[in-house]
Amino acid sequence: MIAGQVSKPLLSVRSEMNAELRGEDKAATSDSELNEPLLAPAESNDSEDTPSKLFGARGNTVLPDPGTPDQHQACQTHPTFPVGPQPLLTAQQLASAVAGVMPGGPPALNQPILIPFNMAGQLGGQQGLVLTLPTANLTNIQGLVAAAAAGGIMTLPLQNLQATSSLNSQLQQLQQLQLQQQQQQQQQQQQQQQQQQQPPPPPTSQHPQPASQAPPQSQPTPPHQPPPASQQLPAPPAQLEQATQPQQHQPHSHPQNQTQNQPSPTQQSSSPPQKPSPSPGHSLPSPLTPPNPLQLVNNPLASQAAAAAAAMGSIASSQAFGNALSSLQGVTGQLVTNAQGQIIGTIPLMPNPGPSSQAASGTQGLQVQPITPQLLTNAQGQIIATVIGNQILPVINTQGITLSPIKPGQQLHQSSQTSVGQAGTQGNLLHLAHGQAATSHSPVRQASSSSSSSSSSSALSVGQLVSNPQTAAGEVDGVNLEEIREFAKAFKIRRLSLGLTQTQVGQALSATEGPAYSQSAICRHTILRSHFFLPQEAQENTIASSLTAKLNPGLLYPARFEKLDITPKSAQKIKPVLERWMAEAEARHRAGMQNLTEFIGSEPSKKRKRRTSFTPQALEILNAHFEKNTHPSGQEMTEIAEKLNYDREVVRVWFCNKRQALKNTIKRLKQHEPTSAAPLEPLADSPEENC
């Protein structure tokens, strides 16, 4: 998705473009009418510079005459394109496009505007980005002051932006298309220079055809040089594919055969559904490729979203802010917001050191990639979930254990007065945070280092550290992880060979070593152990220390040792205890099974009471007594028990359970009806009475 504000100077920019193209439209023949836009109104006229003209087709631009090189260099034109979106959008059209999307009616023009790309139709499977401008005046944004000089057009290099893992393959395809565009431009420039030096071929060598179709068949299409942002923006990649299609067939075929067997570029662009482009890049998915216009005619919102998609394609190669992107290199995280725009958490990012495909053209690419898995924190800095791929795993907060918030003083130093750019998807938007809104940034600078500190590693379990290739064969806090893993594997084999269960081991350890080694302690999972995988790179010293300090020390021993769900320090502490106990158990087993049983011992089993089932007649009598008196006396309960032939304890428990069920029902009713009638008499079980 693209969101943002495009100021009113765009109208003047479009007027200048129409003024330059108005003179060439007079030389167009009737064949150029095949390029009328499918998304623009049919009654649109070139003489009217209205905001609706911004969605006109590029087909109205006629290829210049080869004999006029001055005009050819002064105003570069693009080949015909069936979709017809313009890369320039006005604020009024953006507001009308999202009038039915954002709650609360059409948004004001001084507020951030969002255009969802992933909608019904061809745009449903696309993943997009959202750019939100925090202020209406672009000149207030540090590092983007060049927007005023460029006529209020804000362009950012998005070709290398990796907001989520699902965008990586599509963005790589976009980079390949842009690289093909550059190569094709170089070839076109060379051919154009040669044709300017030599006279054009006589028109008698070809079949008679209109003058507007002769230049694209007898000579290559003029190259597409990126003009300044104040005059014209480059064409989307889909246009570049169709522009290079006729030139790929021209050197290998005779002009006469090309005239008979191959339609003109104008005819190819006017009927794409009947004959799709054979370009290999056209069949691959790309988030910036506009959809099929025939499926969007009856959907004006999707049509304008398609125009915004084309605008995003032109933004990808614009050089308007090539020199003002130094401040954008400090992007350190993503802000995750809900559908109402409320910030619910952050995801750390790290710079991507890979080279930019646009380095030759001088555009500086903003290269960032997310850490996988990602640590998600809320506005207070508390860890609330982890993101692995496209799945968000929520944190299951253990009762009695609270997550320690990250203090603002422990964050990375940020540059003051930096704008907040947002990038998102449908449902929950992912925002690129590089400013004051990121009060819960995670340490991405520590993420780039090869190893973290010992305190952050100690917050992870042995199993997580062993699975990490960076720390699998190393030591953490002086503990050999490989040794711990081998001991846990051998301990399980030795336990099974003795025919012992984990319950028996826990009972024996609890009797000899204390309750910290009981079965309940061994089976208990410490917070953020088995439920989540917190990346070592995303851990911070303060997070690890604060979490460890707030946890009960008794919880650090356990976590099941055999599953390596235990911290290295705890594993190092419990290892000699288990080794000593297992050696003695094996010695008892060799002496005889009876000695092993005596050594293990057995706690007296607590026999569960049989559940009482009441007959319908008994339930009817009990309910009748409960309606009369919810707290019967001891003598009354004895009489009821004798009448129903039940134990008095069974009757007493039934009344206690019935009173508790009634209190729960009253509590639920009060939640649904806050302004209820006079409150009922509170029901309480007094220990002095019957319970």
Curated annotation (Swiss-Prot):
Residues 1-61, 188-297, 435-461, 670-691 are annotated as: Disordered. Keywords: DNA-binding, Homeobox, Nucleus, Transcription, Transcription regulation. Residues 188-197, 206-216, 238-272, 448-458 have a biased composition (Low complexity). Residues 607-666 bind DNA. Expressed in kidney, heart, muscle, spleen and ovary, but not in lung. Belongs to the POU transcription factor family. Class-6 subfamily. This is POU domain, class 6, transcription factor 2.
